[in-house]
Amino acid sequence: MRIGILSDSHTETELHREAIEQLIGEGVEYLLHAGDIMLEEHLKMLAETNLPYVCVYGNNDMALIPFNGQYNIFQEPYYFTIEELKIKMMHMPYFMSADADMVVSGHTHLFESELKGETLFINPGEVCAREKPLSECAIVDVIENKFNVTHYFKQLGQASWTKREVEV
């Protein structure tokens, strides 16, 4: 199973589109967005991929509340299952107990990936390139209950993404 993860798109529509295209080009089967989506246009882009997707509200997503029920966006922490993988997703990294197979967060704008016991904690970094001149996203491959994490990042102004396999 191949899961694409992004967070913190903010108002950077082109970077949001490019991150989604990168993840789709890498063959993801699911998309997760860990909040600070900010624009309905960004939710539409996720929905229009025709891939199963799940989003959580971030601290800057008040304008998206009227679209509750129209898109797959939920309050944090949101628990759900993909195939047999139990996932907890939030924007703010406040609910960090290991009560799921994978815990996804955003907000810090920093890529992080750590396996604690049998739980993968992952923050894909920032799509918006606000804190640093990098747009980021991640892919988690789940193979026989093992996690393989790949961090994708692109310097602003560059056409191609850099791929980095991450030890977990």
Where are the language model's segments positioned?
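Non-catalytic interface/targeting segments
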Residues: 1, 71, 76, 159, ...
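N-terminal active-site segment of His-dependent metallophosphoesterases
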Residues: 1-48, 62-64, 68-69, 134-136, ...
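Active-site metal-binding loops of divalent metal-dependent hydrolases
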Residues: 7-11, 35-37, 59-61, 92-93, ...
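A short, polar/proline- and glycine-enriched secondary-structure boundary/capping micro-motif
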Residues: 16, 98-101, 133, 157-166
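Helix-adjacent hinge/juxtasegments
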Residues: 50-95
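Conserved beta-sheet core of the metallophosphoesterase superfamily
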Residues: 54, 81-152
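Charged phosphate-binding loop/patch that engages nucleotide di/tri-phosphates or the phosphate backbone
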Residues: 142-168
